[in-house]
Amino acid sequence: FDGRNTSANNKATDLMALPVRGCCSDPPCRNKHPDLCGGRR
């Protein structure tokens, strides 16, 4: 199960990489999606 979840998460992360970068540089969006931006500062 872990292997499958990792590969699925990696694909989703790759697809979202560009929009997430824009979101993570936008404080309101980053606050709504802390998990996308690493969560930890």
UniProtKB/Swiss-Prot annotation:
The keyword Disulfide bond applies. InterPro entries: Conotoxin_a-typ, Conotoxin_a-typ_CS. It comes from the Eukaryota. Residues 1-20, 39-41 form a propeptide. Belongs to the conotoxin A superfamily. GO terms for molecular function: acetylcholine receptor inhibitor activity; toxin activity. The cysteine framework is I (CC-C-C). Alpha4/7 pattern. The modification Cysteine amide is found at residue 37. It is found in: Secreted. Changing residue 32 to A: Increase in inhibition potency of rat alpha-7/CHRNA7 nAChR. Does not show activity on human alpha-7/CHRNA7 nAChR. Its main location: secreted. Pfam families: Toxin_8 (PF07365). Negative results: does not affect the following neuronal AChR: alpha-6/alpha-3 beta-4 (CHRNA6/CHRNA3 CHRNB4), rat alpha-7 (CHRNA7), alpha-9 alpha-10 (CHRNA9 CHRNA10), alpha-2 beta-2 (CHRNA2 CHRNB2), alpha-2 beta-4 (CHRNA2 CHRNB4), alpha-3 beta-2 (CHRNA3 CHRNB2), alpha-3 beta-4 (CHRNA3 CHRNB4), alpha-4 beta-2 (CHRNA4 CHRNB2), alpha-4 beta-4 (CHRNA4 CHRNB4), nor the muscle receptor alpha-1 beta-1 delta epsilon (CHRNA1 CHRNB1 CHRNE CHRND). GO terms for cellular component: extracellular region; host cell postsynaptic membrane. Keywords: Acetylcholine receptor inhibiting toxin, Amidation, Disulfide bond, Neurotoxin, Postsynaptic neurotoxin, Secreted, Toxin. Residues 25-27 are annotated as: Ser-Xaa-Pro motif, crucial for potent interaction with nAChR. This is Alpha-conotoxin TxIB. It comes from Conus textile. Disulfide bonds join 23-29, 24-37. Expressed by the venom duct.
